[in-house]
Amino acid sequence: MIHKLTSEERKTRLEGLPHWTAVPGRDAIQRRLRFADFNEAFGFMTRVAIKAQEMNHHPEWFNVYNRVDVTLSTHDADGLTERDIELARFIDGAATHAQPGA
């Protein structure tokens, strides 16, 4: 069974994910990304969708034109787990075309 990260584990793991912030009122993290246009945003989402399917761990996300909002949390654990951290790292790597300060 997947275990929810402890406070110390969470702090340590999130140090390497500076673009991610805590979601108020939830044990989850979020990131907003902006791309040059819809095609770049959709291409990014496609890369993440393939990885998420391989992991059997799917993000909550929302897309409008060039913006993608991503929230990660593991429902089975009712909070943040290593799966979320792994997917967040992949998302950061896949976001090479995201605009700075998004």
Swiss-Prot record:
The keyword Lipid metabolism does not apply. It catalyses: (4aS,6R)-4a-hydroxy-L-erythro-5,6,7,8-tetrahydrobiopterin = (6R)-L-erythro-6,7-dihydrobiopterin + H2O. Its EC number is 4.2.1.96. It is an enzyme of class 4 (lyase). Keywords: Lyase. Gene3D superfamilies: Transcriptional coactivator/pterin dehydratase. HAMAP family: Pterin_4_alpha. This is Putative pterin-4-alpha-carbinolamine dehydratase. It comes from Burkholderia cenocepacia (strain ATCC BAA-245 / DSM 16553 / LMG 16656 / NCTC 13227 / J2315 / CF5610).
